[in-house]
UniProtKB/Swiss-Prot annotation:
Name by which UniProt lists this protein: Heme A synthase
Quaternary structure (record): Interacts with CtaB.
Cofactor requirements of the protein: heme b
Gene this chain is encoded by: ctaA
GO MF, any single term: oxidoreductase activity, acting on NAD(P)H, heme protein as acceptor
Family: Belongs to the COX15/CtaA family. Type 2 subfamily.
Pathway in which the depicted protein is active: Porphyrin-containing compound metabolism; heme A biosynthesis; heme A from heme O: step 1/1
Transmembrane stretches, start-end: 17-37, 107-127, 132-152, 164-184, 203-223, 264-283, 296-316, 320-340
Organism: Rhodopseudomonas palustris (strain HaA2)
Membrane topology reported for the UniProt record: Multi-pass membrane protein
Location in the cell: Cell membrane
Catalysis: reaction(s): Fe(II)-heme o + 2 A + H2O = Fe(II)-heme a + 2 AH2
Gene Ontology, cellular component aspect: plasma membrane
Source taxon at top rank: Bacteria
Length: 365
């Protein structure tokens, strides 16, 4: 059964309840991404050196527990090499950021799983959406493991987490978010928009490049590469830095992940490519009189333009927390608009779908 036919099974108020639930989960994920960004920017991500999915829900409640948590932090290289002499009060500040980030992860897990099980029990979700929503849950469980895998990279030899693992962690969170946004749009059962195949191709390319750009941005963040080369449009004194500076590490591919100049340069070049592609897509959609797809393309181009301005300001000011978080927040908006644009251009044609019989609200199945 196709997605649109499947959504025929979900009549109000059933479909409304499912969409409200998924909207809340998507909003929580967006908040968690921003809290994660603040945790990184405040260098708080390694303040909790243990992984306790259940018992770690409660923070330290007594002086003895606080001192024990602080002593645990003192055993890792970040404290010894960067924060030696930190007071307990200062430790509490970074602890609360990381604890809040982990708590949000637990809240999201509960906010997703419990209503999902209830909807399944009530027969509110058909077979196709069951598979999709179980898949999203599996990605969420994987994300918890990836989060600890990331933190573990900074507990023994490094003074920070691996930028590659950080990028994987962020990108997986955004893939989960995008999957929920896509599902929400499909459940809305919007009429399809007739459009040329080239519009679909450029929309899909925009979505793929947006995810790649978010991954590259996470590499910049993980390396603190936004705190160097704080000029624009020049970088390292040129529009295109010398090959010797871009590719000095061996083997060559390490520069893509470890070289501050190369990582920031890649992020800039991808931003230019995304902006140009979004402009082309918007012009094409408007000229094609693509209706809702034209307005969607214009909104996406506007968001990418704002994102570009915020990115430039963030670099010029050496990554202040406020600008960096605004840049990350608008990145989530860009991703949302890119997902919606692809979905509206690739939605199945309703006329080709068999009509399913509505199921009464109280009847399972």
């Amino acid at each position: 059964m196709t997605a649109a036919a499947e959504s025929e099974r979900l009549r109000p108020p059933r479909v409304r309840a499912v969409r409200i639930w998924l909207t809340v989960v998507a909003a929580l994920i967006a908040v968690m991404v921003l809290v994660g960004g603040a945790t990184r920017l405040t260098e708080s991500g390694l303040s909790i050196v243990e992984w306790k999915p259940v018992t770690g829900t409660l923070p330290p409640l007594t002086d003895a527990q606080w001192h024990a948590a602080f002593e645990g932090y003192k055993t890792i290289p970040q404290y010894r090499e960067l924060n030696a002499g930190m007071t307990l009060y200062e430790f509490k500040t970074i602890f609360w950021w990381e604890w809040s980030h982990r708590l949000l992860g637990r809240v999201i897990g509960i906010a997703y799983l419990l209503p999902f099980l209830w909807f399944l029990w009530r027969g509110a979700i058909g077979p196709q959406w069951k598979r999709a929503l179980w898949g999203i849950f599996a990605l969420g469980a994987l994300q918890g493991a990836v989060g600890w895998w990331m933190v573990a990279s900074g507990l023994s030899q490094r003074t920070e987490v691996s930028q590659v693992r950080l990028a994987v962690h962020l990108t997986l969170a955004l893939i989960i978010y995008a999957a929920i946004v896509w599902t929400l749009r499909r459940l809305a059962d919007k009429p399809p928009i007739p459009a040329a195949a080239r519009l679909k191709v450029t929309a899909i390319a925009l979505l793929a490049l947006t995810l790649l750009q978010l991954f590259l941005g996470a590499l910049v963040a993980g390396l603190r590469a936004g705190r160097v080369f704080n000029t624009w449009p020049l970088i390292d004194g040129a529009l295109i830095p010398s090959a010797e500076r871009l590719w000095f590490e061996q083997p060559w591919w390490k520069n893509l992940f470890d070289n501050h100049l190369t990582v920031q340069f890649d992020h800039r070049m991808m931003a230019y490519a995304l902006w140009a592609l979004a402009a082309w897509h918007a012009i094409d959609a408007v000229r094609s009189r693509a209706g809702g797809a034209a307005s969607g393309a214009l909104w996406l181009f506007a968001a990418l333009s704002l994102q570009a301005v915020l990115g430039i300001l963030t670099v010029l000011h050496a990554t202040p927390i406020g600008l960096a978080l605004a840049h990350q927040a608008v990145g989530i908006v860009v991703l949302t608009l890119a997902v919606l644009q692809v979905e509206r251009l690739t939605a199945p044609r309703l006329k080709a779908l068999p009509r399913a019989m509505p199921v009464p609200v109280g009847q399972p199945g």
